[in-house]
């Protein structure tokens, strides 16, 4: 009797899939950009020591935070590459133990802005960090988004 119930689906439920198994197929790696033939994009970068700017800091167009750096780059730029560019212009980012947290700032459908953290790097890593190789194109970056960099 119990055997018949199992055959008809009345037995014990199946165990869940093992942890750590990715249920979604991996996204294809974006094609590298030919930097000789492709025009760079203007990335507006806002830096702040101690934390990220708030979404209210970006609320009024034309009155964005003052600590802006404009960088011409490509969508295949990695967070490590952007870290090195920020270090060129920010004294705080050059500290030996400085940690840089990256966030995208993008408009929402309510007329304001969202701030979403996307990765973290070290100014002078003693080993490769997990987010170092993430590129703008692998992250949900769209041309026109701002990059907010918190320096700790």
Swiss-Prot record:
What PANTHER family does the record point to?
HISTONE DEACETYLASE COMPLEX SUBUNIT SAP18, SAP18
* Compositional bias (Basic and acidic residues): 28-38
The beginning of the lineage is: Eukaryota, Viridiplantae, Streptophyta, Embryophyta, Tracheophyta
Observed effect of gene inactivation: Plants are hypersensitive to salt.
Q: Which UniProt keywords apply?
A: Repressor, Stress response, Transcription, Transcription regulation
Give the multimer and partner information.
Answer: Interacts with SIN3, ERF3, ERF4 and HDA19.
Entry GO CC: cytosol; nucleolus
Q: Which GO terms describe its molecular function?
A: transcription corepressor activity
Q: Where is this region: Disordered?
A: 1-38
State the InterPro entries in the record. Answer: Hist_deAcase_cplx_SAP18 (IPR017250), SAP18 (IPR010516), SAP18_sf (IPR042534)
**What is this protein called in UniProt?**
Histone deacetylase complex subunit SAP18
- Top-rank taxon of the source lineage equals Eukaryota
